[in-house]
Amino acid sequence: MTEQGPLRPLNPQGFFPLLNKLSTWMWKNGDTPLEHGPCVSCADLKGWLDMLNEPLQPHHMPPRPSRQATPAQIIILGFLGIILAGALLLMLPVSSRMGVVTPFSDALLTATSATCVTGLVVHDTATYWSPFGHLVLLALIQTGGMGVVTVAVSVVMFSGRKIGLRQRWVMQESISAPQVGGIVRMTSFILKAMLLIEGTGALLLSLRFCPQFGLLQGLWYGIFHSVSAFCNAGFDLMGTSAPFSSLTGYVGDPLVWGPIALLILAGGLGFLTWQDLREHRLHFRAYRLQSKLILVSTAGLLLLSFLFFQCYEFRLPQWAELSGWERLNAAAFQAVTPRTAGFNSVDLTLLSEPGKLVTILLMLVGGSPGSTAGGFKVTTLAVLLLSARAVFFRCGSPSCFGRRFQDEALRSASAIFLMYLVFFLLGGTLICCIDGVPLLDALFESASAIGTVGLSICGTPGLSLPSHLILTFLMYVGRVGGLTMIYAVTSGSPVSSQYPQERVTVG
């Protein structure tokens, strides 16, 4: 009798091939009597049993689920990290003019407002924060306007390190690019365009501020307000004349509100639109469909809002102290600034009820995808309106400019619109219940937060801490995007199966 070696552990993965062979043999010979049919040979039996004794191979192991963060998770965590770091810096005594420690709640709201390029503040920017605090705010505004991922990729580019496929993938999601290819060139173009636009705006504003505030302070004011306007942040340093006054002292000065309005529009058009403008110039037909929708929708919103403010709002008795020239300037600027900018050239508390409502709608719409602006975006509005037109006229799929939309665009637009509407109504209702402010004013504050605008009527400093936390959450959701938040939370969820269709009547 030969001595047997130690028993090896059975390979569980060999069970399935064995089961497959046995079932095949039984299927072929199941109807044959055992005494007349073929039987299993010893060689076959030995080969089958050896399957169970085969050692485990590395390639037999099932792949482990990836634990790498998704682009959506990277984006929301990046913004959260920048906000917390900014809040800690603003809490330092060196950040305030009085050299005191700023409460964490105030620092958190201010840092969130700066990073999310909103403009809602509890302390006047010019009088409360020190020059160091202003630098911190400017860095947060620039980082939030460009996007955390864009800034990180830019640092990697300048360091000379190679940008991998995963970084390109995250960058594509961050700027809403149509494809990964050419994303590095796109990032380089964004940086150059940003520096050119902000530099030009700073120069134009300095020509007006330097004679008024002196050379150094005028240059600093030009740089700060240029970056704040291009990033659609709405932070200003004009509180030295009157706290929270914004640009009310320049209502009839186009040398100030004009460059700021142009900077707001440039930042709100989106990076892809800039690329089309650079490559195709005035050849509108050569633009991609998204750029056409952005330009046409933006022009339409600007025209309609300007006509409303000029023909109705600023003809009311409460604006009688403004001259005809100042009313024209105020109407033009008021049509632009609700596009998530946050500057104001008039006292917004004097707005009529229809004026407040129109401003709320403009703040909710916001700017364009892949831009420094917030809101549920003009492309979302365009897709919904064109889809409604297709339903009304029974045109089949919604289309424009000789192109039709994919079904995913309509589903995403509906989800984004509903999400913003729910957060806007819920936030405004909670603020109204907590602080007892009028509902329309509370909705104005809520729309300003989730649209990352920064305009205020009821006065953010006068609200309670729970309302401040609500506004902080709304600003964060409005900047990172509703779908980005959902994708980050639901990543890794199993794909649902396709169920049978059944007709449902709507409307």
Predicted segments with their positions:
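Membrane-proximal intracellular helices of multi-pass ion channels
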Residues: 13-29, 39-507
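N-terminal acidic, proline/glycine-rich, low-complexity intrinsically disordered segments
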Residues: 2-3, 52
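Short basic-hydrophobic amphipathic alpha-helical segments used for membrane targeting/insertion
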Residues: 3-4, 8-15, 35
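Intrinsic disorder/low-complexity segments enriched in small, polar and charged residues
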Residues: 2, 29-30
